[in-house]
From Swiss-Prot:
Disulfide bonds join C35-C53, C39-C59, C43-C61. Its main location: secreted. GO terms for cellular component: extracellular region. Expressed by the venom gland. May block voltage-gated potassium channels (Kv). The keyword Disulfide bond applies. Keywords: Disulfide bond, Ion channel impairing toxin, Neurotoxin, Potassium channel impairing toxin, Secreted, Signal, Toxin, Voltage-gated potassium channel impairing toxin. GO terms for molecular function: potassium channel regulator activity; toxin activity. It comes from Mesobuthus eupeus. It comes from the Eukaryota. Residues 1-28 form the signal peptide. This is Potassium channel toxin MeuTXKalpha4. The keyword Secreted applies.
Length: 63
C-alpha cells in the first residue's frame, strides 16, 4: 500500500512541475510574476538560451 501511495504522490508532483513549466513559457524578453526581467539577456550572458520562466523563481535556460 505504501509503495502505491508513494508512486501516486510522485506522479502528482511531477505532473504539477510539468504543468508549471508548460504554463510559464513567455514570449518576448520579459518574464512572468517576480522573475528576473529580461530573461533572454540573462540567459545569453551565461552563454545559454532562454527556455522558460519559473514563476516566483528565475529564468530557465538551456544549452
Amino acid at each position: 500500500m505504501s509503495r502505491l501511495l508513494i508512486f501516486i504522490l510522485t506522479a502528482v508532483v511531477l505532473s504539477v512541475i510539468i504543468d508549471i513549466l508548460n504554463n510559464s513559457k513567455v514570449e518576448g524578453q520579459y518574464c512572468c510574476y517576480t522573475c528576473i526581467p529580461d530573461c533572454s539577456k540573462s540567459c545569453q550572458d551565461s552563454g545559454l538560451r532562454f527556455k522558460a520562466c519559473i514563476p516566483y523563481r528565475s529564468c530557465l535556460c538551456q544549452y
